[in-house]
Amino acid sequence: WDNANEVLGDPNCKWTQQIYDAFDNLHPNLVKTHVLNLGFEAGLTGFKKVKENREKYGCNVPWVILMDPTSACNLRCTGCWAAEYGYKLNLTNEELDRVITEAKALGIHFFIMTGGEPMVRKKDIMMLAEKHNDCF
């Protein structure tokens, strides 16, 4: 908490500026949902359940999951791995949904979509976000 207080207390910190900018410019319901999902679901209750499951199963249960819904990408960034793998590697909607559902049972509510370019599958990701609206 000391680090968080230090960052939030410094008005010149870029992270503090971004947080305040988000509160000023985003719809209040969006901010509320993100704070609840990240702070409560992922942070408080989720982390507690993750710790319990680490002890119960005797293995590392992560707090966050990085998922690559697709290797497809329309950006062609220099040095990026996605161009080497082509556009055909995709997790199905059922596989993505199953990963999130099973992760939530372990206490994981924080997901980072990587890839390729995840927004190539924007419709699918939005469907997952609506179904799993307690995740960040």
Language model features with spans:
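Conserved alpha-helical substructure of the radical SAM core
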Residues: W1-C135
